[in-house]
């Protein structure tokens, strides 16, 4: 089955396709002829943003679409950055700028209180029915400095206790088997 991926994020597309394998073929917005589509993520929840993206692309193409909205929720920050994860340090901020702001916000917070989770909501929108969502989470805590070279986003400061490593220190196949995105995609049931 083919699904139009409602994202221009190449890292996200590669990770999702690696997790899905041959089960589902993700078609990029460019390949679907709507690479110039712009979707404002203004929802208050991951679910609202994922649904908005999937439905917008489904309406533009007339084809089943899949979207992901994900982020980092840090308990000591009241769940922030949450839906603002990608722009925590401001619109257009780099991963390093976002990480720097996060580490500054947690300066002086003891390890036991640096608990966090990556959250991912996958939405699938079909032309003939209501969209469906699937949620996945990955628990961990925030380190005081970056570790590792793999992954993207906040992976270098997100520690996974089970492995004793940051997400960025894990090989891609291990990360993809435990990540929030993997947990959400594992729940995905496609209706043809």
Residue ranges and their predicted role:
Residues 2-4, 10-29, 33-192:
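Anionic-ligand binding patches
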């Amino acid at each position: 089955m083919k699904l139009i991926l409602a994202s221009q994020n190449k890292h996200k597309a590669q990770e999702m396709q690696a997790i899905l394998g041959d089960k589902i073929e993700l078609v990029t917005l460019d390949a679907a002829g709507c690479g110039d589509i712009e979707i404002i993520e203004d929802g208050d929840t991951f679910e609202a943003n994922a649904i908005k993206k999937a439905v917008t692309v489904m309406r533009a193409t007339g084809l089943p679409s899949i979207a992901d909205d994900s982020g980092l929720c840090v308990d000591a920050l009241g769940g922030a950055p949450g839906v603002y994860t990608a722009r925590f340090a401001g619109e257009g901020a780099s991963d390093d700028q976002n990480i720097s702001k996060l580490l500054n916000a947690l300066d002086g917070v003891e390890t036991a209180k640096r608990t966090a989770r990556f959250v991912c909501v996958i939405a699938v929108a079909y032309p003939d029915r209501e969209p469906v969502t699937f949620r996945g989470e990955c628990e961990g805590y925030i380190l005081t400095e970056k570790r590792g070279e793999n992954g993207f986003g906040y992976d270098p400061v997100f520690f996974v206790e089970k492995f004793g490593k940051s997400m960025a220190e894990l090989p891609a196949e291990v990360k993809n088997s435990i990540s929030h995105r993997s947990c959400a995609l594992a729940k995905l049931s496609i209706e043809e």
